[in-house]
């Protein structure tokens, strides 16, 4: 099966209530599934011969602070035999844990650690769920929308103490708020109807 539309129909029937939403747009298929069924869904996508998504390309998080289920956990899968990609998304609330998929995709180990480090999303049964990108003793989750852009502390080498020290962030200048549109013309973005954005500078009025 090499057509994403046909695959979407097949998966809708196979997954049943586990599939809460499906979207096929701009040549990409995205499935939103129930968090408690994520391992069943991933196993089907990996093992079904019509799917054959053997490779986990990436696993990442996303933060929507105003939403009840604050976080997305997004799995990007690749089938080399079918030459297809698929995106699987799960909604997770703050403080909730999601099952690790290491048993299905061993490459998920470090991806899950990164999502934990950046967003605080916990993965059950990950054998080594430690921070992976931030410094030792780091506090907070840098990719959450409510985390300050500057962070809380800065790290520098103190030549007198001959060691690395932490200290509160000291800004060279105060924050500046830019409340106007960019004067530069952006790239022609793909619109929901599949067309292109109108050319010209959206920041200028006729």
Residue positions per predicted region:
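Terminal low-complexity/charged segments
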Residues: 1-206
